[in-house]
């Protein structure tokens, strides 16, 4: 309950000035998958929020969710106007709720398995009987990690889920888990002194990373909204955002890039909808 209150409080605090200036106009909701803490997300997407607000001439709010599963539920319930999430959820939102894929980042998205560089889990066999960490059961890095574990035939590994991506590495270094699954981007953003204590035991092939998908109710303005995103990427604020987060700019989705995520999307559907 307290976490939900903090999410709402943070979103309200950041959006309040724009709502006051909007003369009661309903906000355009930018939904960001919880790839890191709510505080970091709300700060990270302020440049895009401000740019879209000016382009759309209406208030824009940044919202996230406590975990990836709840984020998917909210998106499928049409709570977001523009959602930014990893490719498997983007595919689910497209196929099940009619969201319109717009673009993604140029930088590769990869999942990684992290261990303590000086810990006892320096090879795959050592993981047998241990506890590993994922985010929520529907995050792409966790789904990849669970498939990777099955391929290793370890059998009795326990998977524990945590809600904050920036805490999994600390838990591994504290000895609370043998290994943690996270994204390569989140690993690269760790403080240098923390990153140096970790080692990548396994790394995925590139997958469809964070994808921008537009709610179908905005189909009439799809072209203008997409153009606003491209213009943001070329602006000083956009260039700073893309550089700071090592995203290399935007790109169009490749043919069938999202369709390739169908197996992962099906796993999310099973968890969220029970089918």
Predicted regions mapped to residue ranges:
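Flexible hinge/capping segments at coil-to-helix
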Residues: 115-132
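Periplasmic-binding protein-like
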Residues: 26-35, 41, 107-115, 193-233, ...
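Extracytoplasmic small-molecule ligand-binding "clamshell" domains
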Residues: 23-88
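Short helix-initiation/N-cap motifs at beta->coil->alpha
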Residues: 62-73, 86, 158-170, 206-208
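A structural signal for short loop-to-beta-strand junctions that line the ligand-binding cleft
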Residues: 97-106, 201
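Ligand-binding cleft/hinge of the Venus flytrap
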Residues: 47-56, 103-104, 141-162, 188-195
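N-terminal export leaders
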Residues: 2-7
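A ligand-binding cleft/hinge motif common to bilobed small-molecule-binding domains
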Residues: 84-96, 171-198, 202
């Amino acid at each position: 309950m307290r976490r939900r209150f903090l999410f709402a409080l943070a979103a309200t605090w950041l959006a309040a000035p724009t709502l006051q200036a909007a003369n009661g106009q309903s906000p355009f909701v930018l939904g960001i998958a919880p790839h890191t803490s709510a505080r970091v997300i709300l700060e990270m997407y302020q440049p895009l929020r401000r740019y879209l607000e000016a382009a759309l001439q209406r208030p824009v709010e940044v919202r996230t969710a406590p975990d990836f599963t709840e984020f998917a539920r909210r998106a499928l319930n049409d709570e977001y106007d523009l959602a930014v999430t990893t490719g498997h959820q983007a595919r689910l939102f497209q196929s099940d709720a009619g969201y319109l894929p717009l673009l993604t980042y140029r930088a590769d998205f990869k999942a990684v398995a992290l261990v303590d560089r000086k810990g006892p889990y320096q090879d795959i066999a050592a993981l047998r009987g241990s506890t590993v960490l994922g985010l929520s059961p529907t995050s792409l890095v966790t789904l990849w990690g669970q498939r990777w574990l099955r391929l290793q035939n370890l059998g009795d590994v326990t998977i524990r889920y945590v809600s904050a991506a920036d805490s999994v590495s600390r838990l591994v270094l504290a000895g609370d888990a043998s290994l943690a699954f996270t994204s390569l981007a989140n690993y690269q953003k760790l403080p240098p002194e923390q990153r140096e204590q970790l080692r990548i035991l396994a790394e995925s092939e590139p997958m469809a990373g964070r994808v921008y998908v537009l709610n179908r109710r905005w189909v009439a303005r799809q072209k203008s909204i997409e153009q606003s995103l491209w213009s943001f990427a070329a602006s000083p604020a956009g260039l700073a955002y893309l550089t700071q987060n090592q995203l290399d700019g935007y790109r169009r989705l490749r043919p069938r890039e999202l369709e390739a995520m169908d197996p992962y999307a099906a796993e999310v559907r099973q968890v969220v909808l029970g089918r």
